[in-house]
């Protein structure tokens, strides 16, 4: 796809506010800033910024979209980054009344690459929170800046392409020579890793089935757009509701809203619609199939499918399938044995094993409510040539009504 060139001229940062309407139309990908455009802007002077094509900041805030526009850098003021622990954080001053629109609530996560901040609105009309994913560029080399900008642009490109209730929503983004900021909706339940670690004993098969149904449908939707996530894991799956709400829901089949949202599209990539071939390896090793672990070219759709199998196993068992119990063996020995189990697809059920002893001849799996979950794991944690894809799993879902969701009936795949 040819990229449309944008002239940076006197602008040292570019802001691209998004509204809910833009979210639901066919996105103009060519209108996104190219890697060259942003790299050029990294060398310009911030003081040369002029933005004149946005509405005056002191207008009345009528909608949530108006509030998001409060993150737009207009006239003489800019986004301020203050230390956590102070009473004010990421916010924009109004030229009229010098009041903050947003304040840092807490730091959700922090890595060498970027920090994720929970930001709360100070506007009493909108009692809401959003998430800022913030990357500092000032301390990085030029090559590091270009690499981070490339990843940042890929994430924007992916999120602008997608419109699905189980994918996080891109609200705004911000580019300057010093920082990259991604603004997304906030999921109150946190990530599935910490939720599973804390509340796994409360998981019902219906709850796990609901999560897995949404996951499979969403990943099949990504693949219909020729997009591979490449980093599907519990940490990148967010729950839209907190524990105190989830524990009160007893009918997951007819729950009207999305329970999960997939996030973190930094490593996602668009592929050819015919062979889905990916040359590079990335993502988390614990969720990567053997072909990715060994660094060979692979079918990206089937690699995502393997990750879904790992996630489902973890939801059922409360652990990852190829992890062994702690031993005193040297690390190189543990890694070697891990790879051996991985390649052989050698995992063992404990919590979700069949209650029937095959030697007795009692093999009526219809009386075992967990058998279909084990079957799905078996279809996903297989050799790549035999592994089911999410799209193929959807056909199985259509055969079994317990795995179809009214919520997603109108989403085209």
Swiss-Prot record:
Catalytic activity: L-seryl-[protein] + ATP = O-phospho-L-seryl-[protein] + ADP + H(+); L-threonyl-[protein] + ATP = O-phospho-L-threonyl-[protein] + ADP + H(+)
GO cellular component annotations of the record: cytosol
Record-stated family: Belongs to the protein kinase superfamily. Ser/Thr protein kinase family.
SMART domains named among the record's database cross-references: S_TKc (SM00220)
UniProt xrefs under Pfam families: Pkinase (PF00069)
GO molecular function terms listed in the Swiss-Prot or TrEMBL record: ATP binding; protein serine kinase activity; protein serine/threonine kinase activity
Highest taxon, organism lineage: Eukaryota
Subcellular location: Cytoplasm
Protein keywords: ATP-binding, Cytoplasm, Kinase, Nucleotide-binding, Serine/threonine-protein kinase, Transferase
Name of the protein this chain belongs to: Serine/threonine-protein kinase ppk27
Broad enzyme group: transferase
Residues at the active site: 231 (proton acceptor)
């Amino acid at each position: 796809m040819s990229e449309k060139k944008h002239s940076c001229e006197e602008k040292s940062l570019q802001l691209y506010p998004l509204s809910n309407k833009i979210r639901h139309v066919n996105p103009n990908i060519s209108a996104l800033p190219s890697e060259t455009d942003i790299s050029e802007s990294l060398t310009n002077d911030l003081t040369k910024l002029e933005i004149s094509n946005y509405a005056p900041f002191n207008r009345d805030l009528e909608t949530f979209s108006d509030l998001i526009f409060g993150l737009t850098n207009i006239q003489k003021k800019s986004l301020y980054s203050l230390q956590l622990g102070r009473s004010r954080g990421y916010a924009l001053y109004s030229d009229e009344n010098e009041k903050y629109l947003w304040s840092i609530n807490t730091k959700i996560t922090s890595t060498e690459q970027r920090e994720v901040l929970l930001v709360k609105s100070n506007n009493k009309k909108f009692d809401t929170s959003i998430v800022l994913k913030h990357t500092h560029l000032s301390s990085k080399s030029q090559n590091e800046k270009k690499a981070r900008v490339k990843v940042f642009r890929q994430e924007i490109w992916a999120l602008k392409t997608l419109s699905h209730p189980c994918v996080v929503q891109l609200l705004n983004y911000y580019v300057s020579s010093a920082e990259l900021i991604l603004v997304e909706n906030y999921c109150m339940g946190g990530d599935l890793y910490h939720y599973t670690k804390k509340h796994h004993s409360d998981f019902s098969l219906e709850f796990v089935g609901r999560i897995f149904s949404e996951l499979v449908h969403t990943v099949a939707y990504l693949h219909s757009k020729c997009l591979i996530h490449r980093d599907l894991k519990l940490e990148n799956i967010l729950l839209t509701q907190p524990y105190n709400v989830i524990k009160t829901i007893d009918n997951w089949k007819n729950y009207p809203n999305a329970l999960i949202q997939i996030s973190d599209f930094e490593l996602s990539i668009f592929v050819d619609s015919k062979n889905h071939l990916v040359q590079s390896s990335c993502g988390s090793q614990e969720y990567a199939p053997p072909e990715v672990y060994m660094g060979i070219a692979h079918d990206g759709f089937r690699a995502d499918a393997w990750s879904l199998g790992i996630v489902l196993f973890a939801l059922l068992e409360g652990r990852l399938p190829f992890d062994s119990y702690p031993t005193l063996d040297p690390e190189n020995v543990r890694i070697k044995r891990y790879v051996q189990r991985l390649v052989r697809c050698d995992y063992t059920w404990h919590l979700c094993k069949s209650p029937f002893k095959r030697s007795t001849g009692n093999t009526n799996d219809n009386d075992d409510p967990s058998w279909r979950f084990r079957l799905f794991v078996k279809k996903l944690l297989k050799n790549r040539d035999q592994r089911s894809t999410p799209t193929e799993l959807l056909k199985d879902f259509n055969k079994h009504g317990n795995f179809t969701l009214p919520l997603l009936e109108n989403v085209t795949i």
